[in-house]
C-alpha cells in the first residue's frame, strides 16, 4: 500500500513539473514572439535550475532566438550550445535550426556549418537558415551548392529565400548566366511566379546587370505591381542613364493609381537635370510631393534644393531653404553646394558664417562643397578662411578634404600652402600624389613634379590615368620635352590604357616646343580618332613655328571637319592666313563665318580688388 501511495506522489510530482514547464515554455514563447527578448532571457536565467531535461529541451529554441536577437555576449550562446549537447538536445532538428540562426546572427560561419553538418535530420528550415547565413556572409557559390542540395533532397525553398539569393547575386556582380539560373528556379514554380517580392528582386537584378530587355519582360509579366516594383524599375533606369524611360515610368505609375513614395521621388529626381528640362520637371515632382504630403520630409527637401540648383534655379532652392522649419546639416550642405556650383563664393561664405551662428557644425560634405567653391573662384583670401574652418572642425585628417585643399591652394596661386598641406597629410593616397604633381605643374616646377612622381612610384602606388595626365601636364608647363617623351613611351610599363586626354596633352607639348613633325606623327598613329582639341593645338603650333606647309593645311582641314560650328577655329584659321600673306583666303574664312552667323566669343576675366569680386568681359571697360 505504501508503494502505491509513493507511486501516486511521483506521478503527481511529474505532472506538476510538466505543467510548470509547459507554462514556462508558453510564457517564454510569448515574450520572444512579442520581441521582449531581454525579459525572456531574465526569466530563463531565473528558472533554469528548476527545469528538468524535457522542460529544458522544450524552451531551448525560444531562449536561443532571444539570445541571438538581443545580441547577448557570444559566451551565453556558447553556454546554451553546451547545455544542448549535455542534455542530448542537439539531436532535435528545431533546436539545431535555432543554433544555426543564432550563430549566423553572431557571424560565426564555421560554427553554423559545423552544426548543420552534424544534424541527423534536416528540414526546409535547416537549409533556409544556412543559406541565409551564406547570403549574409557573401558566400554566393556556397549558397548555390546548398540550394542544389536542397532541391536534390526534395525541399522547396520559399520565395523570400530566393529573393535573398538574387540580392546576393546582384551585390556580388555575378554573371548573367548565374542570374538566369535563379530566374529558371522561379519559372518552374508557380507559387514563386506569383511573389511580388521575388519578381521585384529579379527586376532589380537585371537592371543592375544593365539588361533592360529582361527586366522589362519580368516587369510586364507581373500580375500585381506595388510601389516597390515600380520604384525598382524607375531607380534602375535612372541609374543606367535611361532617364527618359525613368520619367515615363514615374508618370505611368501614377496613371495606375499607385502613389510614389519618398524613395521613388528620390530615385527619379536625378533624371531632371540630365534631360535638360530646366526646373519644370523638378517643379512637377515637387508639386506631386505637396499633393501627397511628402514635402515635409527633410531629405526630400534637401534633394529638391540640390536639383533646383543644378537646373540653374538657385533662387527657388533658397526659398525652400528659408521656409524649411528644420534646417539640419544636410540642408545647409545642399544650399552651400548649390552656390558652389554656380561659383558664388561670397554667398557660400555668408552661408557658412550664418550656419556657425545658428550653432550647426559643418561636416565633411559641407566643407568639400566650400573648398570646391573656393577652387573655382581662385580667391586666396577665401581659401585661407576655409582652411581655418577645416582646422577648427578637426577635419584635417580627412583625406578627401586634404586632397581638395592641395588642389584649391594650387589653383589659388599658393604653391607653398599646397606643399604644406601635402606634407602634413598623415595618409596619402593616389589622389594626394596626383594633386601635388598637378600643383607643381601649374606653377611651372617640372623638376619638383618629376621628383614627386618618382616618390609616388617608390612608395608602391600604381600610376593611374589621373597621375599620368598630371605628370604630362607638369612637363608641358615646364617645357620638359625629353622627360615627357620618356614617360609617354613607358606608358605600357604602368599597365594603364592611354586615353584621348593623355594624347591631347602630349601632342600639345610637342607642338608648343616646335616638334611639329613628331606631334603630327603621333596624331595620325593614334589608336582612336583625334579630337578637335588636338587638331586645334596642332594648328596653333603650326602658326607659332611658321609651319603652314602641307601638314598645316591637312590639320586645318581636319579641324574644320571636326568642329564646323566653333567660331574660335575660324578666327584661328583667318589669323594664320593673314600672317602668311594669304589675305584672299583669310577674307573667305570671315565670309563663311558671316554666312554661318558665327561670332567670336569674348574673353572673360575675374579680379579681386579689396576682397570684392569683379568680373569683366573682353568688350567691357574697366575703371581699374
Curated annotation (Swiss-Prot):
SUPFAM superfamilies xrefs: TPR-like
Keywords on record: Mitochondrion, Repeat, Transit peptide
Annotated spans, Type E motif: 534-610
InterPro entries: E_motif (IPR046848), Pentatricopeptide_rpt (IPR002885), PPR_At4g14850-like_plant (IPR046960), TPR-like_helical_dom_sf (IPR011990)
UniProt main location, coarse: mitochondrion
Transit peptide residue numbers: 1-15
Stretches assigned to coiled coil: none
Example of a GO cellular component annotation carried by this entry: mitochondrion
A Gene Ontology biological process term: RNA modification
Record-stated family: Belongs to the PPR family. PCMP-E subfamily.
Protein name: Pentatricopeptide repeat-containing protein At4g31070, mitochondrial
Gene that encodes it: PCMP-E7
Amino acid at each position: 500500500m505504501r508503494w502505491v501511495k509513493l507511486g501516486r506522489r511521483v506521478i503527481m510530482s511529474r505532472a506538476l513539473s510538466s505543467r510548470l514547464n509547459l507554462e514556462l515554455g508558453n510564457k517564454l514563447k510569448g515574450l520572444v514572439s512579442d520581441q521582449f527578448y531581454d525579459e525572456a532571457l531574465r526569466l530563463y536565467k531565473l528558472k533554469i535550475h528548476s527545469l528538468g531535461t524535457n522542460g529544458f529541451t522544450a524552451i531551448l529554441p525560444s531562449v536561443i532566438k532571444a539570445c541571438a536577437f538581443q545580441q547577448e555576449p557570444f559566451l551565453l550562446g556558447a553556454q546554451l550550445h553546451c547545455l544542448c549537447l549535455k542534455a542530448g538536445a542537439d539531436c532535435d532538428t528545431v533546436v539545431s535550426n535555432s543554433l544555426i540562426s543564432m550563430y549566423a546572427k553572431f557571424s560565426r560561419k564555421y560554427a553554423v556549418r559545423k552544426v548543420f553538418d552534424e544534424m541527423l535530420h534536416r528540414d526546409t528550415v535547416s537549409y533556409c537558415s544556412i543559406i541565409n547565413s551564406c547570403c549574409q556572409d557573401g558566400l554566393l557559390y556556397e549558397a548555390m551548392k546548398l540550394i542544389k542540395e536542397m532541391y536534390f533532397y526534395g525541399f522547396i525553398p520559399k520565395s523570400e529565400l530566393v529573393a535573398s539569393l538574387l540580392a546576393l547575386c546582384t551585390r556580388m556582380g555575378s554573371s548573367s548566366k548565374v542570374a538566369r539560373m535563379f530566374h529558371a528556379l522561379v519559372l518552374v514554380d508557380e507559387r514563386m511566379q506569383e511573389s511580388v517580392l521575388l519578381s521585384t528582386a529579379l527586376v532589380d537584378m537585371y537592371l543592375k546587370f544593365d539588361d533592360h530587355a529582361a527586366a522589362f519582360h519580368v516587369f510586364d509579366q507581373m500580375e500585381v505591381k506595388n510601389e516597390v516594383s515600380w520604384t525598382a524599375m524607375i531607380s534602375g533606369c535612372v541609374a543606367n542613364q535611361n532617364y527618359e524611360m525613368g520619367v515615363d515610368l514615374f508618370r505611368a505609375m501614377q496613371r495606375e493609381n499607385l502613389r510614389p513614395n519618398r524613395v521613388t521621388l528620390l530615385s527619379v529626381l536625378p533624371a531632371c537635370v540630365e534631360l535638360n528640362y530646366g526646373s519644370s520637371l523638378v517643379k512637377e515632382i515637387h508639386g506631386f510631393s505637396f499633393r501627397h504630403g511628402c514635402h515635409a520630409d527633410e531629405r526630400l527637401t534637401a534633394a529638391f534644393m540640390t536639383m533646383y540648383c543644378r537646373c540653374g534655379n538657385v533662387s527657388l532652392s533658397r526659398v525652400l531653404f528659408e521656409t524649411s522649419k528644420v534646417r539640419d546639416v544636410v540642408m545647409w550642405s545642399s544650399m552651400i553646394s548649390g552656390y558652389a556650383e554656380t561659383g558664388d563664393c561670397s554667398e557660400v561664405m555668408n552661408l557658412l558664417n550664418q550656419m556657425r551662428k545658428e550653432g550647426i557644425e559643418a561636416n565633411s560634405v559641407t566643407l568639400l562643397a566650400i573648398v570646391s567653391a573656393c577652387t573655382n573662384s581662385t580667391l586666396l583670401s577665401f581659401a585661407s578662411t576655409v582652411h581655418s574652418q577645416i582646422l577648427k572642425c578637426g577635419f584635417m585628417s580627412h583625406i578627401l578634404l586634404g586632397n581638395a585643399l592641395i588642389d584649391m591652394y594650387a589653383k589659388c596661386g599658393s604653391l607653398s600652402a599646397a606643399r604644406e598641406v601635402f606634407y602634413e597629410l598623415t595618409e596619402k593616397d593616389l589622389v594626394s600624389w596626383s594633386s601635388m604633381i598637378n600643383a607643381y605643374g601649374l606653377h611651372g616646377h617640372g623638376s619638383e613634379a618629376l621628383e614627386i612622381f618618382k616618390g609616388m612610384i617608390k612608395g608602391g602606388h600604381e600610376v593611374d590615368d589621373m597621375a599620368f595626365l598630371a605628370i604630362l601636364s607638369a612637363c608641358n608647363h615646364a617645357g620638359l620635352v625629353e622627360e615627357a617623351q620618356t614617360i609617354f613611351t613607358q606608358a605600357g610599363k604602368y599597365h594603364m590604357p592611354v586615353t584621348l586626354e593623355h594624347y591631347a596633352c602630349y601632342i600639345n607639348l610637342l607642338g608648343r616646343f616646335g616638334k611639329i613633325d613628331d606631334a603630327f606623327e603621333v596624331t595620325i598613329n593614334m589608336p582612336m580618332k583625334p579630337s578637335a582639341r588636338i587638331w586645334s593645338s596642332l594648328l596653333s603650333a603650326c602658326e607659332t613655328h611658321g609651319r603652314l606647309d602641307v601638314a598645316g593645311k591637312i590639320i586645318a582641314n581636319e579641324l574644320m571637319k571636326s568642329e564646323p560650328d566653333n567660331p574660335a577655329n575660324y578666327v584661328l584659321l583667318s589669323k594664320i592666313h593673314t600672317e602668311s600673306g594669304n589675305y584672299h583666303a583669310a577674307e573667305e574664312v570671315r565670309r563663311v563665318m558671316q554666312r554661318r552667323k558665327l561670332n567670336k566669343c569674348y574673353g572673360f576675366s575675374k579680379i579681386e580688388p579689396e576682397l570684392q569680386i569683379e568680373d569683366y568681359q573682353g568688350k567691357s571697360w574697366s575703371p581699374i
